[in-house]
Design a protein with these regions (language model features):
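Structured soluble/peripheral alpha/beta segments that form catalytic or ligand/cofactor-binding pockets
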Residues: 1-268
């Protein structure tokens, strides 16, 4: 949860084994739960509830577009070799309203959300040290997902990829050569991990006439303090401005960066 007005960032994570009162899923009842966190889809949309000692979320969600299945033929290849891939599904534009409780106050909110679900079958290659992932909602009702995988020598991995979603929900798979993600000189140094993250980017997708700049309204959105074996993430809100063809365009999004403190060892 990013509180832009007060410059605060909140993160909560919970791991439970399956069992009564712990965690589970019931397709028959249309419900997923993890303690008192839950998603309920019996109403046709989704109802999301999550409570932490610092904040509480209660949202009603309804997807405006069909799910997107990334990759080619439903497989998002991440590296050379059998099994080095994922299945990756997104709901890229979800009408959302509800309440956020923070600091003893309740706020009514509405907006547009995004949901991702990705599961891997194997680890990355040793030469792949991290990634930069962008999810972007543009004002013309299109969405853009771009993944830049970084290699140890500083080059961009050929398995970098993306997806463009048009206003009607049609999707186009993008290969590494179809787009450019270029970090600019603005860096934020984390006091927790000492990692230096690029917090301004240039984004180019010539195939769709898209030229954007992305920057974050809140530099401190790093997720640390998990297992020592887990990657450290910078994961937070970004604002977008630029052009699509001859028209100016704006948008919002989310940026995830890993491997800036040490090489990621996902799956090893």
């Amino acid at each position: 949860l990013s509180d832009l007005d007060n410059g605060a960032f909140y993160h909560a994570e919970r791991v439970n084994r399956a069992g009564p009162g712990l965690a589970g899923i019931s397709e028959a009842n249309g419900r997923i739960w993890n303690g008192n966190w839950s998603v309920d889809w019996r109403s046709g949309g989704q109802t999301l509830r999550a409570t932490d000692e610092r904040f509480e979320l209660n949202f009603a969600l309804h997807s405006e577009k069909a799910p997107i299945v990334h990759g080619e033929n439903g497989v998002s290849q991440k590296a050379a070799g059998a099994g080095r891939a994922s299945h990756y599904i997104s709901l890229t534009r979800i009408a959302t309203n509800g309440q956020i409780e923070l600091g003893g106050k309740s706020f009514d909110v509405s907006g547009t959300a995004w949901m991702d679900h990705e599961f891997f079958t194997h680890q990355l290659e040793a030469e792949q040290v991290g990634w930069d992932w962008f999810s972007m909602q543009l004002a013309d009702k299109t969405e853009l997902i771009l993944l830049r995988i970084r290699r140890k020598d500083g080059s961009v991995d050929p398995y970098s990829a993306g997806t463009f979603v048009d206003a009607n929900g049609g999707q186009t798979h993008l290969r590494a050569g179809d787009f450019t993600l270029q970090p600019m000189d603005d860096l934020w140094k984390s006091p927790a991990s000492n990692a230096r993250y690029p917090i301004r980017w240039k984004i180019s997708v010539p195939r769709f006439g898209i030229e954007l700049e992305a920057e974050t309204p809140l530099a401190s959105q790093e997720i640390t303090g998990r297992s020592k074996l887990a990657p450290i993430y910078w994961e937070g809100a970004i604002a977008l401005a630029g052009r699509r063809g001859d028209s100016s365009i704006a948008g919002v999004g989310y940026l995830e960066m890993t491997g800036y403190d040490r090489p990621v060892e996902l799956g090893h």
